[in-house]
């Protein structure tokens, strides 16, 4: 990726009220995007958001900017990110825009774009938008200004799409499922999808108030879900993040089932049904246990850089159809164009219903290696801690100690000023000690 001023790995993101997530910048962003997108002929853009209170302000700013450039906005209201990608395709809109900071706290927000195909915008389009941002804002003639309207049946359209990815001959009758919607964008979607397919549904994290998105709930914190699954004697639990593009599951014993295990289940089921094309894509963070388990099944495995856009790029490069991050981004190109938590969960539920097996049993063919992740905050602009000699030396020592039976990965977060230190190996105590040793070295520089 080229060096850009505003667009990161997942659009533009930051704290609301601080540059660039301010009303004036977002208005200009809408205008700049409108100027670039108008060159392609279409005059309509889908705008969706999660449940953050700042979404109202930011969608109004985007609408004003787009209208000034001559594009009309179609609002979905609170809607999962993958739903916006789907609606962008079905409405033949020139682009889709999602106002969300995904799994971040409510005081953050962000803007990301989808192309007419429902995929992330190509780099060159993002670069063209950045170039327009450097210009003075202008307005088209009054007769050419854009309009705004709402898609009144957006939720219903997406619910039917999700249900369509679950086999007609199967149902979820007899399954009791606890669903944690992270007080986010899936709150009015996921429970209805599961109920309409026959499940008994218990909901948590489904009362958004604009401030409680991702707060001690959802895919980034499944402790409450684990407790409720056990207390309710449910068959399983499903947790989404604030914008619905991630999913983490919990088995009937309260054990967490992450994106690596979900990818394993979906890949194995695809192999059993003769529907798996090629192999599966993970990331540098994917557990070694996934690689070992897939190898035992004869399924090729490739690692991409961390970030769903890189998983997708690797899938396209290989011509493969399934990929995932252990954080719960699961991309299934036979079903949709981007990471979709609900669709991914439905494919796991397909394996449960078809094989009459529990989620716990479906995971049993894959043994996770102990993997310790430590996040270390650093001050932006203070130099790169990863390039410091002390950090390099400690990392090398750990790598030599682990040999071929473990891995070390240090990387910067694409969305926050964090260094992520990951150490993986067969001995949990050793791996934990190594991870904190490296993290301490990073903190000290």
From Swiss-Prot:
Its EC number is 5.4.2.10. Mg(2+) binds at residues 102, 241, 243, 245. Its cofactor is Mg(2+). Keywords: Isomerase, Magnesium, Metal-binding, Phosphoprotein. GO terms for biological process: carbohydrate metabolic process; peptidoglycan biosynthetic process; UDP-N-acetylglucosamine biosynthetic process. The active site is at residue 102. It catalyses: alpha-D-glucosamine 1-phosphate = D-glucosamine 6-phosphate. Activated by phosphorylation. The modification Phosphoserine is found at residue 102. Catalyzes the conversion of glucosamine-6-phosphate to glucosamine-1-phosphate. HAMAP family: GlmM_B. This is Phosphoglucosamine mutase. It comes from Cronobacter sakazakii (strain ATCC BAA-894) (Enterobacter sakazakii).
């Amino acid at each position: 990726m080229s060096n850009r001023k505003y667009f990161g790995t997942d659009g533009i993101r930051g704290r609301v009220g601080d540059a660039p997530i301010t009303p004036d910048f977002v208005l200009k962003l809408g205008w700049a995007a409108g100027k670039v997108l108008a060159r392609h002929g279409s005059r309509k853009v889908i705008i969706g958001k999660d449940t953050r209170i700042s979404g109202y302000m930011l969608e109004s700013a985007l609408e004003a900017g787009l209208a000034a450039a001559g594009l009309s906005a179609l609002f979905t209201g609170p809607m999962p990110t993958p739903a916006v990608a789907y609606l962008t395709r079905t409405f033949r809109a020139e682009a889709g825009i999602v106002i969300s900071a995904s799994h971040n706290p409510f005081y953050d927000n962000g803007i990301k774009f989808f192309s007419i195909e429902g995929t992330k915008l190509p780099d060159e389009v993002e670069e063209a938008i950045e170039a327009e941002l450097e210009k003075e804002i202008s307005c088209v003639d009054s007769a050419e200004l854009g309009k705004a309207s709402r898609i009144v049946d957006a939720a219903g359209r997406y619910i039917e799409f999700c249900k369509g990815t679950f086999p007609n001959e199967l149902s979820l009758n007899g399954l009791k499922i606890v669903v944690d919607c992270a007080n986010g964008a899936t709150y009015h979607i996921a429970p209805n999808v599961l109920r309409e397919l026959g499940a008994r549904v218990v909901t948590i994290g489904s009362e958004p108030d604009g401030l409680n998105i991702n707060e001690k709930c959802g895919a980034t914190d499944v402790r409450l879900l684990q407790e409720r699954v056990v207390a309710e004697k449910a068959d399983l639990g499903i947790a989404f993040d604030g914008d619905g593009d991630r999913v983490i599951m919990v088995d009937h014993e309260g054990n967490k089932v992450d994106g690596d295990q979900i990818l394993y289940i979906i890949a194995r089921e695809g192999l059993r049904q003769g529907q798996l094309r090629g192999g599966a894509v993970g990331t540098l963070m994917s557990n070694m246990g996934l690689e070992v388990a897939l190898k035992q099944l004869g399924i090729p495995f490739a690692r991409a850089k961390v970030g769903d856009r890189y998983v997708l790029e690797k899938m396209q490069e290989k011509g493969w159809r399934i990929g995932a991050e252990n954080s719960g981004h699961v991309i299934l190109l036979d079903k949709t164009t981007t990471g979709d938590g609900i669709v991914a969960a439905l494919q796991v539920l397909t394996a449960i219903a078809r094989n009459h097996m529990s989620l716990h049993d479906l995971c049993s063919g894959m043994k996770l290696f102990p993997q310790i992740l430590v996040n270390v905050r650093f001050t932006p602009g203070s130099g790169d801690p990863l390039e410091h000699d002390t950090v390099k030396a400690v990392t090398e020592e750990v790598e030599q100690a682990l040999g071929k039976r473990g891995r070390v990965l240090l990387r910067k977060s694409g969305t926050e000023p964090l260094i992520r230190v990951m150490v993986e190996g067969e001995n949990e105590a050793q791996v934990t000690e190594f991870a904190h040793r490296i993290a301490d070295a990073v903190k000290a520089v």
